[in-house]
Structures are given as structure tokens and as C-alpha cells.
């Protein structure tokens, strides 16, 4: 048992003169095995390796470990967006009881999600960014939309939006949501849209894709 408050430091950010656009892509279940071209048709990470060289250090982080209980979608989102682990029970506010397991809630089950925590979306919003999240699965899964909209995200797109947009049925996985291929195609279009908007308004953007 531990208290996150014993370790938590409120972020202090000084904005630079140049506000760059940010595109963050979550490679859920991505691992080194996908680079083995003897097991697969090709090394899936070639584009990443070309974009950021090994000298940058990202391809091999010594002693890097996933924290206990951190191997599921919302735990990964919270860890990367907020810099804290997501404990299994209690969401830091709202109408959920303290014993509610974070893995079993929907958007209607909580009013707020880690309301006392400063996350990436909060910081970017305070610095004038437009924040957009795109996911292939349902936005209501594990109260994902509640978390995102409560932490600076202006637009959250998920399964219901892709169905409403007329995506072909064969492009959906019955056990999850929109295929990665179609999600990335939509993300590319969204980047173009956000770039055009940024040129008109001068407002930078953050696009997170999972």
C-alpha cells in the first residue's frame, strides 16, 4: 500500500516562445517481437526507426518496467497523460463509491475522474492548445471520455462516432471497435484539419490516438 500524495509533485510548466503541435500515438500491445521480420512479413517499427534514430535512446530503455496493475488501457492513458499510476479502486471524485473498481466503470458511473490531478490535457489547454482524442473503441469504456473531457480535451471521438460517420461494417472488429488501419486513416485526415485550423487561428493542437 502507498499514498500517491507522498510522491506527487504539482507540475510547473514554462511555455516556450514556439508552441509546437503534438501528435501522440499509443501503440497498445506493441513489443519488440513485432520487429522480427522472420516471424512477420516485415519489421513493423521501420517507420518509427526512420523517424527517430536509436541514438535518441527510445528503442531500448534499460530497466524499464510496467508497474503492477498498469497493463490495461486506462492505466496506460493515465500514466502517460498524468504521470501517476492508476490504482484499481477509487477515481478521485464523482459519485462513485471508494470501492468502485476503475476497470468496471462507464461514463455514467462517475462525475469526475482524478479531478485533483493536473494532466497533459490540462497543461496544454492552459497554454492555448486544442486537444483531440481519437480511439477505435467506445469512448465510454472505463469512463475514458469522462477522464479526457475533465482534463482539457475538447473533442473525443470513438466507436459511436465512426458508426455515425458511415464506416464500413467490415472495418469494425466485433470484439473492440474500428480497425487500426481505418483509425489511422481518419487520424491523418484530422491532422490535416487541425493544421488548417491552426493556420487560421494560430491555436496549436494536440492529437492523441489510440
Regions found by a protein language model. Give the residues of each.
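Soluble catalytic regions of membrane-associated enzymes that act on cell-envelope
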Residues: 1-210
Amino acid at each position: 500500500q502507498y499514498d500517491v500524495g507522498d510522491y506527487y509533485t504539482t507540475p510547473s510548466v514554462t511555455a516556450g516562445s514556439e508552441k509546437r503541435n503534438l501528435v501522440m500515438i499509443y501503440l497498445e500491445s506493441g513489443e519488440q517481437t513485432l520487429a522480427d521480420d522472420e516471424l512477420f512479413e516485415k519489421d513493423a517499427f521501420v517507420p518509427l526507426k526512420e523517424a527517430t534514430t536509436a541514438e535518441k535512446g527510445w528503442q531500448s530503455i534499460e530497466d524499464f518496467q510496467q508497474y503492477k496493475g498498469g497493463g490495461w488501457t486506462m492505466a496506460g492513458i493515465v500514466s502517460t497523460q498524468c504521470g501517476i499510476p492508476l490504482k484499481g479502486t477509487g477515481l478521485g471524485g464523482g459519485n462513485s463509491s471508494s470501492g468502485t473498481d476503475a476497470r468496471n466503470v462507464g461514463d455514467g458511473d462517475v462525475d469526475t475522474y482524478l479531478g485533483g490531478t493536473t494532466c497533459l490535457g490540462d497543461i496544454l489547454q492552459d497554454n492555448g492548445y486544442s486537444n483531440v482524442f481519437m480511439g477505435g473503441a467506445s469512448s465510454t469504456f472505463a469512463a475514458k471520455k469522462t477522464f479526457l473531457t475533465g482534463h482539457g480535451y475538447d473533442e473525443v471521438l470513438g466507436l459511436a462516432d465512426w458508426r455515425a460517420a458511415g464506416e464500413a461494417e467490415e472495418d469494425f472488429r466485433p470484439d473492440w471497435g474500428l480497425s487500426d488501419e481505418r483509425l489511422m486513416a481518419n487520424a491523418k485526415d484530422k491532422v490535416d484539419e487541425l493544421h488548417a485550423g491552426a493556420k487560421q487561428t494560430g491555436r496549436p493542437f494536440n492529437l492523441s490516438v489510440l
